[in-house]
Amino acid sequence: MLNQKIQNPNPDELMIEVDLCYELDPYELKLDEMIEAEPEPEMIEGLPASDALTPADRYLELFEHVQSAKIFPDSKTFPDCAPKMDPLDILIRYRKVRRHRDFDLRKFVENHFWLPEVYSREYVSDPQNSLKEHIDQLWPVLTREPQDHIPWSSLLALPQSYIVPGGRFSETYYWDSYFTMLGLAESGREDLLKCMADNFAWMIENYGHIPNGNRTYYLSRSQPPVFALMVELFEEDGVRGARRYLDHLKMEYAFWMDGAESLIPNQAYRHVVRMPDGSLLNRYWDDRDTPRDESWLEDVETAKHSGRPPNEVYRDLRAGAASGWDYSSRWLRDTGRLASIRTTQFIPIDLNAFLFKLESAIANISALKGEKETEALFRQKASARRDAVNRYLWDDENGIYRDYDWRREQLALFSAAAIVPLYVGMANHEQADRLANAVRSRLLTPGGILASEYETGEQWDKPNGWAPLQWMAIQGFKMYGDDLLGDEIARSWLKTVNQFYLEQHKMIEKYHIADGVPREGGGGEYPLQDGFGWTNGVVRRLIGLYGEP
């Protein structure tokens, strides 16, 4: 079964006549002519071909048996295993022996699969190293080479070297990589920047978009579209000229806007929603509506407690993963219950700000190349998006940006995602000033800014602080002239990370910052990860700007 743009489509996403158990949703549109097979990965010279099938597709009931039996503590382990022989032979063997009285599932898996390698197990940090030295010495530990790919594994081969976040994440991730690149540039690792630039361009060429990560099970979704920001970084640091990426930026834009022209007001298709006034805004989406391979058991359990059709819940869980904020009160109908997730009904402020940046980048590079018609078209698109955001996502009463629930036609919760319009230059100065006041009073702590002001047990909420949010807030407020707030966030975050490093001698994915005593951040569906790519990247860049704490 090939990946498709829509597999097992959610009944709520259909507007065609089929037999359904649930009432059709008048808001959603599905177009038969837009369903086409995912492109197969191309061969990379000297490397085995990547397999476009996900482990759940390929191993069928064996996959479900392994995940249901919890033979590994982390649901991501089995999808990341690589087969020792042809996967079809493994499935045939499993079907022959699974009903034997002495069948041992764990031994079967160990005999037929290579378990994921933990690359950093032998690395021990030197407690005498400064924070800067520690980060610079971690880049080789977090670097993966193309030859690491094993035939038939879920890992998608890439033509060049790349950085992984660390811990359970042994592949490259889309939006993580941008913040990691900030540190690579500061460390003088132009070699790795060039490799990663080529890898992301290659993925757009071969898949039509940048997947969530380079795994087959990530092909059905992307992540926050930050390639335009990467291109800007490549240009600023002299790594690659921006002009060479214009076609790639246009291809990514086409992916995010697919189906837009066929929509009428109050309809949605994939990532696009046409608002009541005819304007276009975007949402997060995943083309599949099945449990995620990497969190299969967790998704099945969540759906059981939802009281909704399971495929609806799976789609929203997947879309939440596409947002990068997996998970947060931003996506929940009931902030204390993950089963109430409704990601696809929210118009996110950060996503639309990133797409504003993408539209602006296409316009700017088109101008450099003398393509005046394209420049004018995309300036108009960026302007229209900013106007729509101001109509639907700006809360003038409270002076903040908020996500918008397009189904209920009401504003949603306030979070640190509200700072992204400043980072991409979409806000006006009055909006920036008012948002600064809200951040000071509602999100700022002695350790940095909180992801949100709500305690839900989810990792992208209070009490946690995340490196990418700090960076965008620092630069965003400084861009609008609020150096005082930007510098305060920067120094607070550096103090948080350095204090934890001095005590634990490591960098981690997220930090508990709510009470001024930095410690490990909690929440989420997996244990805290160390490494950690984007924390290293942001902190290394801040050290270059502010010095070591």
Swiss-Prot record:
Q: Where does substrate bind?
A: R168, W175, D176, N212, R221, S222, Q223, R292, D293, E294, G324, E525
Subcellular localization is given as: Cytoplasm
Could you tell me what reaction this enzyme catalyses?
Answer: alpha,alpha-trehalose + H2O = alpha-D-glucose + beta-D-glucose
Source superkingdom = Bacteria
GO CC, any one term: cytoplasm
GO terms under biological process: cellular hyperosmotic response; trehalose catabolic process
Specify one Pfam family.
Trehalase
Active site location: D326, E509
The reply to whether Cytoplasm figures as a keyword in the UniProt entry is yes
- PROSITE patterns tied to this protein: TREHALASE_1, TREHALASE_2
What pathway is this protein a component of?
A: Glycan degradation; trehalose degradation; D-glucose from alpha,alpha-trehalose: step 1/1
Q: What is its EC number?
A: 3.2.1.28
UniProt entry keywords in alphabetical sequence: Cytoplasm, Glycosidase, Hydrolase
Query: Annotated Gene Ontology MF terms?
Result: alpha,alpha-trehalase activity
Q: Which family does it belong to?
A: Belongs to the glycosyl hydrolase 37 family.
| Subunit field text | Monomer.
Please state what the protein is called: Cytoplasmic trehalase
| Gene expressing this chain | treF
